[in-house]
């Protein structure tokens, strides 16, 4: 097991400064280019790196300032994954909002580009020597849990086990190796699904999709271990179990008992960040 940089650590997500929120809105309206937005993101990341170092943190993130969604930004760049265009829904109070886009696996999953490399290189350039830049990516289980079997092409994957899980793990392995080649030694996978499987409402939703919520944690442990088996030597691979967060409101509750065996006995990860 690889050791954490210090006895204290953090998940890595920070509130975006107002000027970055405004720039993202301008980009969405077509008022600025992606290149102009990236320069604003660079400024915000430089500032949040300094903040983390000033308070004494040893693992340093980019605040996740380049993300729109914690999972889609990454997974949508894998070959074989398609994200539907978000639709506007009307809420009970009459207001409208964009529903989160839906991801589907439409072909064989594969690594077609280095997804986080440029982001990591900028982060690394800002981190003081002696501190450790940390990269956060979504858990591979995000490609299965939300849509279940119906969200994965039967033409590409008549059976999920083992081909689907192997293909996703291989794609993740390629990404981890590209990061390691650039000097990354610390990667965190963000996973909502194991925490969701502690909540009876979410467990019932899994049943409705045709999955067994008692079996899923063990299947996901084996799935995640396929990724862990491909991590480069010297890389720390952690998992953040997130209960969901929207305007400081969690999406799932419940103790960890339904997933504890799979989480703590079966998975081969180096560290966990667990929300209570």
Where are these predicted regions, by residue range?
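Domain-level signal for soluble alpha/beta catalytic cores
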Residues: 1-276
